[in-house]
Amino acid sequence: MSNTFDNALAQPQTGMDLEGVSTVAPRKKSRKNARVTLNDPGVQATQKVIAYLTIIVPLLGLVAALYLAYQNGISQLDIALLVGMYLLTNLGIEMGYHRLFAHRTFKTFGFVHYLLMVFGQMAGEGGVIYWVATHRRHHIHSDTALDPHSPHTCHTGAEPEELNLRRGLLHAHLGWMVNDKVTNSALFTEDLTRDPLTKAINDLYFPILILGLIIPAAIGGIVTNSWYGALTGFLWGGLVRMFFVTHSTWLNGSFAHRYGSKPFETGDHSANNFWCAIPTFGASWQNNHHAFPLSAMLGLKWWQIDIAWYFIWVFEKLGLAWSVRRLTPEHIERKRKVA
């Protein structure tokens, strides 16, 4: 493992500020909008094209898959491919992109580190550097005009504006990806860009994304020995899976910043949304998360389902994860709202 990789993961293990965003992210709100977002027409146009493809193509795949299922039924293999690829890519997002790369809540071996990165890129939510930069920006400017996907306010035009319920949910779920306010990744991801292999994997986003579509198609074709099996594997394990993974992630910025309980003082509108916990692998405990961004565990009650945490816990027991950041009762009580 390279020294660059070791330095990128370096983080203090004593006196942990579990209320910060990341041990490596900017800690103060940037004051100039031009510094937070890019004013590059070429980058903005490219981002819009990618965003529209990310939204529309999986939706078309879902429609095609449902039509074929109506005509011919759906096989157990297709269901297995959907579930299996959903598990791998959503773990890549929630365990990898989110808790490991964005917030550095645990450490792991280089092989696991980069494998989670690859699985995350197969999900179809952008390269790891773009995703982490956008997420750290969201935490630093949560539910303000500089938050990229707040359902309460936005800065997509000349001036910031407050959003009503319908516009807010639409903006936070999908609309934020197709405006001109592209996050300045260099401001938020110095730790990632210092590692050459991370940069190389990030630059291979589209080949890795396509690989995530080819794998279920190949499995479907080989197991059934038919082109139809390859097609349905591509649809259910590829595009349909991508549709559900991306929309589950987007729920965290839209519904989980509008609906749910708010036991902690966070200074924003983040809420704990029970109904989204399973598809998001625990990310929808947004109020918990915004209160303690550096905690590896988001589900703080026994009934708060947190699938990504269960995997981190198992990895720790197997010796595959260490320096796992945990909350103390004092951390929790200090942030709890006074009734």
Curated annotation (Swiss-Prot):
Extent of motif Histidine box-3: 286-290
Compartmental location: Membrane
Keyword Lipid metabolism belongs to the record: yes
Transmembrane segments: 49-69, 73-93, 109-129, 204-224, 226-246
Cofactor section: Fe(2+)
GO molecular function: oxidoreductase activity, acting on paired donors, with oxidation of a pair of donors resulting in the reduction of molecular oxygen to two molecules of water
Gene Ontology annotations of biological process type: fatty acid metabolic process
Gene Ontology terms: cellular component: membrane
Catalytic activity: decanoyl-[ACP] + 4 reduced [2Fe-2S]-[ferredoxin] + 2 O2 + 4 H(+) = dec-9-ynoyl-[ACP] + 4 oxidized [2Fe-2S]-[ferredoxin] + 4 H2O; decanoyl-[ACP] + 2 reduced [2Fe-2S]-[ferredoxin] + O2 + 2 H(+) = dec-9-enoyl-[ACP] + 2 oxidized [2Fe-2S]-[ferredoxin] + 2 H2O; dec-9-enoyl-[ACP] + 2 reduced [2Fe-2S]-[ferredoxin] + O2 + 2 H(+) = dec-9-ynoyl-[ACP] + 2 oxidized [2Fe-2S]-[ferredoxin] + 2 H2O
Statement: the UniProt record of this protein carries the keyword Oxidoreductase: yes
Motif (Histidine box-2): 135-139
The protein's Enzyme Commission number: 1.14.19.78
Membrane topology annotation: Multi-pass membrane protein
Keywords of this entry: Fatty acid metabolism, Iron, Lipid metabolism, Membrane, Oxidoreductase, Transmembrane, Transmembrane helix
Intervals of motif Histidine box-1: 98-103
Protein family per UniProt: Belongs to the fatty acid desaturase type 2 family.
Function as written in the Swiss-Prot or TrEMBL entry: Desaturase/acetylenase likely involved in the biosynthesis of a polyyne metabolite. Efficiently catalyzes two sequential oxygen-dependent dehydrogenation reactions, the conversion of decanoic acid loaded onto the acyl carrier protein TtuC (decanoyl-TtuC) to 9-decenoyl-TtuC and the conversion of 9-decenoyl-TtuC to the alkyne-bearing product 9-decynoyl-TtuC. Shows stringent substrate specificity toward C(10) fatty acyl substrates.
Domain characteristics, as noted in the entry: The histidine box domains are involved in binding the catalytic metal ions.
Protein name in the entry: Decanoyl-[acyl-carrier protein] acetylenase
Source organism phylogeny: Bacteria, Pseudomonadati, Pseudomonadota, Gammaproteobacteria, Cellvibrionales
Recorded name of the encoding gene: ttuB
